[in-house]
Amino acid sequence: MVPTSALPRSPGHPFYAALNKLLAEAKFDAYVEGLCEPLYREGGRPSIPPGVYFRMLFIGYFEGIDSQRGIAWRCSDSLSLRSFLGLKPTESTPDHSSLTIIRQRLPKELIEQVFSFVLTMAFEKKLLKGKSIGVDATTLEANAAMKSIVRREGGGTWKAYLTQLAKEAGIEDPTDDQLRQFDRKRKGKKTSNDDWQSPSDPDARITKMKDGTTGFAYKAEHAVDLDTEIVVAADVKPADQADGETVKDTVVDAQGNLNDATKQECRITEVVADKGYHKTETLVWLGDRGIRTYVAPRRDTRKRRWDDKPEGWQEAHRENQRRTGRDKGKQLQRKRAERVERSFAHVCTTGGARRTWVRGIVEVSKRYLVTVMAHNLGVILRTLIGVGKPREWASMRGFLATCAALWLAILADLVAAGHRVAELASDFADQLLRPRWHFSTSPEAASSTAC
């Protein structure tokens, strides 16, 4: 038997200690436990506290781990992360399967309430303005393979489809190599979402990925406060939906989150987006709600006709074009390109959300929303302590150590130079005080100099 006092302990990571302090001041654990209480049974085996569940998913963002299995491994290996989770030395960390069960049981509406609570934390720290909103989208790689696609009608596989086409082209009983060669050379091939789907994740859509390949994906859309870089709304949508249509739901969600977080003190007055969102119907829809649009216009050499369009469409189009061409519009577009893209870089590239390991648009949305939640906490911490991720803390320590080493080297050089200057000054003073000519008063010297 090993006494508890003999078990290894950790003083904790300074970044996670600051995050725990921030959550404790906002009473985060009490809030999420109150929300989840109706979903827990009174009897039975003690369950995992909701605060521990959310903290483990936060760790996935801060450590750049995309899978729940990897998160569980990382937490079990680190004493500082165990301290962040509030686990005793004798307690084991939750298994990855427990994270899956909890995620499936928690409804998406509850995750959205917790997201609004984090926005309230940002508002209390003066980090939520909600006036100018930048909107953009990116693709998320789905947990589905193109080689397993099936027909929506009938469920036929891609291989069976190719075999039928090969037989129609005169190739009887084609081999796998012949099918691949036939598929590579045939013209007019098209893989449409109307005809094909993934049997493992029917919600995923066939689309072009960031690297130029074709695969199953989802679309993640952010609405970012351009003044503070807080993400006020984030949702996952089918990858084949047009940006001009999904922006309406995103703006509605953003305003609803702001109302919940600020008690209706913040109102969206400006929406900034790239040319992918330029749709006259959407411009009119936003204008009717008192929102000024700064949407980059598409480059269209054709002369547009407005006689067959509803009243007000031409005016909305031209007003948006004039606003975007002014200095303020150009400044907002630069800010959108910088800050909205930065949110995707933090959440997807370094935060582990680019590749999804769960299936179904609802499950992907819940997992992604918690990751964005962690990103907002990182923005708050970056304002309070100067860093928003543990790796930034390590980089800052390295930078400060380098600065300290340089300062000590410079100081040593100055001290050495000071000693050298003192020696030179002393020698110079000696030269000044030493007489240039020596006159002797001895009789011998006097007689020798007499005329």
Where are these regions (language model features)?
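Generic start-of-chain signal for non-secretory N-termini
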Residues: 1-9
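A short, ordered amphipathic alpha-helix with a cationic face
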Residues: 5, 44-47, 87-89, 344
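Basic, short loop/linker segments at the boundary and entry of helix-turn-helix/winged-helix-like folds
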Residues: 9-58, 63
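Short amphipathic alpha-helical interaction patches enriched in hydrophobic/aromatic residues
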Residues: 40, 60-61, 83, 103-106
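Anion-binding and metal-coordination hotspots
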Residues: 66-76, 87-451
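Secretory-pathway/luminal and periplasmic proteins that interact with or process carbohydrate-rich
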Residues: 80-86
